Amino acid sequence: MSSPTSLEEDGDIKLKTRFQGQVVVLYARPPLILDDFFALLKDACKQHKKQDITVKWIDEDGDPISIDSQMELDEAVRCLNSSQEAELNIHVFVGKPELPGLPCQGEDKTVYRRGARRWKKIYLYNGHRFQAKRLNRRIQCFICHDYIWGIGRQGFRCVDCRLCVHKKCHRHVRTHCGQALQGPNIIPMAPASGSLKGARSNTSSSTTRSGGGIDNGAFHEHEIESPGSTSHDASRAMNGNGSSKWAVSLNDFRLLTVIGRGSYAKVVQAEHVSTRQIYAIKIIKKEMFNEDEDIDWVQTEKSVFEAASNYPFLVGLHSCFQTESRLFFVIEFVPGGDLMFHMQQQRKLPEEHARFYSGEIILALHFLHSRGIIYRDLKLDNVLIDAEGHIKLTDYGMCKENIKDGDLTSTFCGTPNYIAPEILRGDEYGFSVDWWALGVLMFEMMAGRSPFDIVGMQNSEENTEDYLFQIILERQIRIPRSLSVRASGILKGFLNKDPTERLGCKLDINEGLRDMKEHQFFRGFIDWEALEQKAVAPPYHPAVESDRDLTHFDHQFTDELPQLSPDNPDVIARIDQSEFDGFEYVNPLQMSREDSV
């Protein structure tokens, strides 16, 4: 078996190894040889080479299977390849069971249940023990020299030598942990296209050693200037011990009224105490995160908020903070309500209104796609209308990140009425699902109903969703005769059940964008450059008297007081607070504005 430090990534087997409350992630080149495999695991778990261990892998049914022979190891790898899983999940226990069939010390059936325990994850590579870290300042990645900065735990830091790299770069570290880090010891990689130019930094290839760790220029947490800010602004972002002078807490806000509620969160209108600026705060209870995968959508939402914050048709982020029991996203307050509320008042919209809204939505979706993000939750409720009448997409918890040209994903998700046929078929999919959802939304705007109405169904509620999915997959969509030829044409284009033939779904997303812009529904009616600059007058201007006006929000929410229920100490005690390390975030551009007030 090749060393796990091999730099060749294609064909490596990812071993996700659970041992005594930790997850150690390592990589090995096939073929796996039993003795080498056990030696690798003992080293990763810091066990003596003569120590007996028991190794079990988890099959696709979630059952633990022992690995005691080369044949059993080969079978585990064969099953991994046939199931096309991304990793081999392994549990390691010290010693052997007293008798065959008996559990090992520390083994009980709950250890195999997903989400039953919290595991501290370590990525082992070249002797480095990397952990995901939310870095509070911009730090240069030792490999690609781009800056590790943003929302979420996108940075990896070695717990021993404190080497900092992007997650995507950690397998390109050539030097072993503890060795002097010099330029020749690093695999050359092209700097990322998003590198910040002219950042204040004295980083170089030289290194010095301080104490037991590595003191490299790339690891000094230099503040660098944000676009449009001054050096002074940037340098005051953090104080000497790394805590933020701009720290935000619940005490900074006065909660006014509830403006929305979903499956996972409540949204409250709030006033910033010192600036009197109005925001919306999305509040999520930590107790709902009882599965390891549940936390992922929060990290995704933060990451997409960061990408969206300066784009005109996407809701931006002010800050994030937490208490022992809750997470808080402070976001833009958009006073015109959402398209769902607007449609309830209007029943259906003129084609020119639908053309304007769908044009701005196309620009917003293309912006996300150009950054490798599938939105996956386009619906009337998630399209907000600002005070001038322009739209903003919101709610990024369903997004899928890191989609490059030709990449596909397979997660079954979305709002039932908007789910694309390829998702329902279990096919892998890409950006195509967003253009299908836009077709559904445009149909709703212009026809005043869903293209998949199942009103009058005799089935029980349990079967209604299955029947809806059957309709989406099989039934031909009937376009109302009242719609123009142009409108009918674009609906047929977006609602094509074959994603390879669907409007906007070219491998080159810019080519797909051109196809949409040049469709007869838009051609000659929209100046796309002016639209992106918000220089096209909206067809509807919501009557908003002030930033506190709630006229365009449903009274079932606004009549509710924004009270937070008292914390239950027993519930708090069961929450693993380390899962939320680094959740705090402050948009430096927002805080600079507040400082100037």
UniProtKB/Swiss-Prot annotation:
Region of interest called Disordered, as start-end residue ranges on this chain: 192-238
Recorded GO CC terms: apical plasma membrane; cell cortex; cortical actin cytoskeleton; cytosol; membrane; plasma membrane
Cofactor entry: Mg(2+)
Pfam family, one: C1_1
Organism from which the protein derives: Caenorhabditis elegans
Active site (UniProt): D377
Effect of I214A: Prevents binding with num-1 (isoform a and isoform c)
Name of this chain's protein: Protein kinase C-like 3
Domain Protein kinase: 253-522
Polar residues bias spans: 227-238
Subunit structure: Interaction with par-3 required for the peripheral localization of par-6 and to form a par-3/par-6/pkc-3 complex, which is activated when cdc-42 interacts with par-6. Binds avidly to the phosphotyrosine interaction domain (PID) of a novel pkc-3 adapter protein num-1, which enables tethering and targeting of pkc-3 to the cell periphery.
Domain AGC-kinase C-terminal: start-end pairs: 524-595
Feature: compositional bias, Low complexity: 200-209
Entry note about domains: Residues 212-224 are capable of binding the PID domain of num-1 isoform a and isoform c.
SUPFAM superfamilies named among the record's database cross-references: CAD & PB1 domains, Cysteine-rich domain, Protein kinase-like (PK-like)
Protein keywords: ATP-binding, Cytoplasm, Cytoskeleton, Developmental protein, Differentiation, Fertilization, Gastrulation, Gonadal differentiation, Kinase, Magnesium, Metal-binding, Nucleotide-binding, Phosphoprotein, Serine/threonine-protein kinase, Transferase, Zinc, Zinc-finger
E.C. no: 2.7.11.13
InterPro entries xrefs: AGC-kinase_C, Atypical_PKC, C1-like_sf, DAG/PE-bd, Kinase-like_dom_sf, PB1-like, PB1_aPKC, PB1_dom
GO MF, one example: zinc ion binding
